[in-house]
Design a protein with these regions (language model features):
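N-terminal structured subdomain of primase-like DNA metabolism proteins
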Residues: 1-92
Length: 92
């Protein structure tokens, strides 16, 4: 699987598979409690149309690869391996 194909994995579905659901949602995006740190007010935004995320409290964002790197404190290559693992929600 190429890096571009991996980046197409749906962030919303990935978060849902991890049990992380939006606090507020519109057709184009959702606000979540950050999966990267403790917080009481949702400041983690996922743009569903661009398949990108941004944590306003931490000042970081990016693709699903960046999200996995931050969530699991792993490097780029380990994140690619993680996202290629069987059982992960995929985009066809």
């Amino acid at each position: 699987m190429s890096i571009e194909q991996i980046k197409k994995n749906d962030i919303r579905a990935f978060l849902a598979q991890a049990g992380i659901t939006p606090v507020k949602e519109t057709p184009t995006g959702g606000m979540y409690l950050s999966p990267l740190r403790q917080e009481d007010t949702a400041s983690f935004h996922v743009d569903y149309t661009k398949n990108r995320w941004y944590d306003h409290g931490a000042g970081v964002g990016g693709s699903i690869i960046d999200l996995v790197m931050h969530m699991h404190n792993i490097d780029f290559l380990d994140a690619l391996c993680y996202l290629e693992a069987p059982g992960l929600v995929r985009v066809q």
